[in-house]
Every structure is written in C-alpha cells, then in structure tokens.
C-alpha cells in the first residue's frame, strides 16, 4: 500500500528514512542548481568538449554547468532552451567564497555515490567522472579569479559591462574571512584525494597543505576570532583530518576544539545562539571521531541532552530562551539541530524513544509542513537502479518511496520552484502556526545545508543501498581519557534561559582589487591552468613565529605568507 495518509506517514518515519530524505533532497538540489539553474557563471558546451571525454558529457549536452555560483536568486523554474533554468533577471551576482567552496565539496562527496554504479549503470557512473572534472574547473576558476592581490580568497562580484566582450569580476568591500580560507583548503585537499588519478592532484594537495600550515604556525592568533568563526574553521579542520590523518592537523583540531568548548562554557552562552551551539556540537562529534578523546564525546552528548530539553513536546517546537510571542529560526540552525540529533545515535547506542520522537516532530513541523523547503524532488523512477538495494532491479530489493520523499510533498513540477530552503521560519505562539520567509535562494545558506546533509549521511546511505554489513562496534578507543593536556576543568552546560546571540567578530579588511573582463556573459571559454607555481611546494615552516614581529596581527602574518608563496 503506497499511500497511507499524510498524517500517519509523517509520524511513522524512522530516523533512517528522515536522514535518507534529507540526503536525497540535497543531492538532487545540488544536481539541479549546478547543471540547470544557470545561477552563476557557467561553462559552455564547447569548453566541456575540450575538458571532458565525449562519453562523459553526452548526458549533459543540454546543461550549462556552473563553475561559480551567485549569492542570491529567485528559484522560479521556467522552460527554455536551457532546460529548467532560473530567471536570470533576479540574480544577485555576488560570488561568495563560502558558497563556491561548499558547492565543489558537495560535488566531490557525491562522487563516492555515483562511483558505485560502475558496470551497473553507465550514465550514473559517468556522472562521477563528470563531477570530478567539473570540480577541477571550479577550483581553477577560484584560484584565478577569487583571490585578492595578497592571495586571500575573497568575495567577488560579477559586474555587468557595457562592452559586449564580457563581464568584469571585481572585488567587494567585504572583509576577508578566515573560515573561507579553511573551506578552500578543504576543497582543494578533497579534490586531491577524490581524484588521485589526476596528474595535478599532488599540486592541489600541496596547495591545501600550505594553507593548513599557515593556520598551524599561527594558531595562537586564531583564538582572538569569534566563537562562530572558530567553529567554522574547526569544522573544516576536522573534515580535512578525516581524509588526511595529518598529524599537524590533528594537533590543531585538539587545540581548537578544546578552545571553542571552553570558550563556550566560560561565556555562559553569551556568544551562543542555536546555530553556533549546533555547529559546536557537530565539531565535538567530529573531534571525538577523529581523536577518540572522551571529553569531546561527553560534551557532545551533553549538548544533545540540552537540545532535547529545548524541545517542547506539547507544542512541537524548539524553545529559544524564555516564552515569547514569536520564535524566529534560521534555516541553518534548524538543519544543524536536526543533523546533530540524527547523528547522536552513533555515539549513544541506547535506543532513545524521546530523541526519535523529537526528530520526527522537528522534521514534520519544521521541514515538511512549514514551507521552509519550496519543493521536494520526485523519487527515482521504478526502472532506475537507484530505487533498488544492490542496484538489482529486482522487486524484492525495491526501496520504498519513503526513503526519498514524503508521498504528499509538492514536487518542483507542481510548485514551479526549485527545491531549496528559504532563509527563515517564524512560529507564532498565539496562532500556533509556522510561516516561512519570502521565497529567495541564498547560496551561502543553502550550499552549507546541502553539504552538511550530504557529508553527514551519504556514507551510511551507500552502506544501506549496497547492502554492506554493518561494521563492528567499538571502533573507538575504549580507554578512559577524561581530559587533554592543559585543558581546564569543564563546567556544566549553561541553563536554557541563558541563551542569547552575539554578533561574531569580523576579521580585518583584506583590501580591494580590480579585475579584467574574463568571459562572455554566463560563459567561460578559457580557464587558466591549475596552480603549478613551483613556489607552491616550498615549505612554509620558514615563516615561523621567531621570524615575525610578535606585535603583527594575524592578518599581516597571513598576508606575508600568502604573498611570499604566491598562493
């Protein structure tokens, strides 16, 4: 029986089905945005033929893949010669570093899924190679056009030129973000590991390690940044450690994770809102996975308990502070909150009906029924290998539609809207209803959410669909490690009514620069080669603290390094 009823179906979803639906939503949204939306600078078919094998691009002949993504747009879909493109008159042509790094990271993570279709489905399998090559084009573009004269990755904008020869990429007045440098570090490093067959992969790895060493050498100065910024940097370092097992990266993760945890406690939540606290929790999860140190596990589970206590089961809402007439939630804090609860079962083997109930209600109230998601992609067709365990196409292996979407959810074809998250959600305590924000696509928010969902859930889903036996438990070390070296005693978590927000510290300005026109509108026919400067491989350790005036701030030190190595 396929349709049981929306109310019963929503309340009967398992945590595995919810995680799978969030993954599928993210996977299909990224596919659509990158291949069809044209919400950014795209490469044309001629360029694809020059950089891709013929059989790799035959399935994408009508698409215009993005090599960079813009910040904002209306996600209304209309049919044209470019298939399901968006209305380009609504594009805000800022080019954020974070959105673009996260877009590339999402594509690279999806490669592991599509590679499973080798010798099963050539179209799906070739998507992996296509995404690798496209990711490389994107990274080449970032290296060439998204850096300022000092070498920092900075936000740019695509200024329309009166000349028909192309568009101008110019620098915005935004301040340089250290977390943006960390995101790019992760993107370049992940490419080197996902595409080891590429002769340039070692160059990309060396480039990423240069940025890592910059953070390692000047880690003390990182501690002057905001808690939110430190959490974002720590998240990138944790994910890089998962791929690299780099000892310097591990030591930095230990120091920075310990620092943000103590800073959170010492501040008595003065710095924290739900978004930052949820990102902190995710870092504690990753830090424990990477180091097996129990202090991080305990902190994570304490935060999970706090999240559970924040949920009002009677009203079905997340409480933020004392009673209010209206609660406002950002899309990122809702998704991080839900991700943490879903992942908590990895570290807490005891079944928790309370947590599963919260997950079900948060997903139903905040994601499905609130309107914060504009549409849900259709499940794969019954003749698709994606619908079957082990890709068998056998009726007994058919995967239920509930692993992909709610049966009563609106599809993009019905709404005319691409599947994205609107920015905010409000809950009226008087009317007991949710209202979503205006329908606008913000890539800085959406690409973050999509990457978090893909990165958090794709490995388990691959194990599920390939019917891989569960790995034995107790992979973690079991020795009791209650504290780290030089770690202060941890205080109890702050009470719920102490929650409030604080504006993050903004890093210093990185300067401006004018750039020449680079392309015809929405097309790039030529892209500069990948970073192959021999200075890239030079050891950065020579720029030690002893060689730099202690009074220099972090920004100046980083500029010296980047300028010297021509990053």
Q: Where are these predicted regions, by residue range?
A:
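Glycan-recognition and catalytic cores of secretory/periplasmic carbohydrate-active enzymes
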Residues: 1-567
